[in-house]
């Protein structure tokens, strides 16, 4: 196997793909800053149409719907990943669904001038559909075009795109920029620009060579793309691995979502995938950002929004740190470190929140705990769940697995957003004890059940899971080895 290099075509393709990740992050964070302004828009529009003052309950319900409908769209979109990637390919799927981003951006951008609450809500739903699809497309594409030795580092770029998107949304949402009564439609409609940029650039990116060889049987084209992307002529071993997987796929029946749970050789990796996604959303990261503005204010920070943006900067910096660590320390190790550090910080936040009224210096302890909590999140639970799912499955079950994992992430995100305000109201600072318990459970699960995938090919990882499956239950028989016994590929050394 030739030594793969970081080439310009590879960096270009991954950068263009992560525009989809940026879109997800941007549209997640963009709705928060102009909350009061959008509520005024809802109030004025409803009053004009009904000729009467809308109730506070109706306004709150419409605002909540505007926020939550994004996650509903994400759930539907993420579950539809397989419908696109198997038919159109990875690259073409990313290209096609930008129509949703442009449509959603137009609906939101023109809702004010049209005096239409319905356009705002529909736009959020459509952009949610788009982002849900992107959470499947982007990690899958990056994982399939990256050399084995760099797959984790490049996979982390998906999360980097997300956190940069959130940070840009926070900055653009400032009153000095687009967070004003006049310009907030531009803030929401900005999502059109990255969509158009990605549409213009994607035709210059290659299709996934794994898709071309395994799904389309285009071996020569796949070989040519691999050589160009990896900067080496010696890709014979990688091509052979894909051909072996293609033969393996031909011997198995088509993998559906139900088959992932029924087939013994898929059951363990899909459970791991779901648990890793839950470890991200149930870690308490959204709760920390929910509390952060108030905590910064209590600590005497004059403009808490800038401190929250500072937390977003920490978010971004430690995602970059994770990028350099993931191929050295490994996925499993970083995930364990992240979960353990977050559990400690969560406990520290509970104590400091309970004592800050009696001891003002405790507010600064809490701020420190928040920033370190965010740092630990981006070392492990932030980036790793997104790309490790693509590593745990072969070409056949991968689209269905990405759909299930993505849907579980979006669903848990939706439920946390729905239930957290009530939990915070009744439990106060003790709400972080709940997240601490979740973090401990996920740490134990990761320690005992999650394998290390660093430096291993897709074929090696897939084979390793079959060791626990009785021979008669496997979809296909063949040589099997323990996950712990697989040596990393030479590229990874």
UniProtKB/Swiss-Prot annotation:
UniProt KW keywords: Cell membrane, Cell projection, Glycoprotein, Membrane, Phosphoprotein, Sugar transport, Transmembrane, Transmembrane helix, Transport
Residue numbers on the Extracellular membrane side: 33-64, 112-118, 175-183, 291-304, 353-363, 421-429
PROSITE patterns assigned to the protein according to its UniProt record, in alphabetical order: MFS, SUGAR_TRANSPORT_1, SUGAR_TRANSPORT_2
Binding site for D-glucose: 159, 280-281, 286, 315, 378, 386
Catalytic activity: D-glucose(out) = D-glucose(in); D-galactose(in) = D-galactose(out)
Subcellular location: Cell membrane; Perikaryon; Cell projection
Chain's role: Facilitative glucose transporter. Can also mediate the uptake of various other monosaccharides across the cell membrane. Mediates the uptake of glucose, 2-deoxyglucose, galactose, mannose, xylose and fucose, and probably also dehydroascorbate. Does not mediate fructose transport. Required for mesendoderm differentiation.
Subunit-level organization: Interacts with SMIM43; the interaction may promote SLC2A3-mediated glucose transport to meet the energy needs of mesendoderm differentiation.
Name of the protein in question: Solute carrier family 2, facilitated glucose transporter member 3
Native species: Sus scrofa (Pig)
Encoding gene per record: SLC2A3
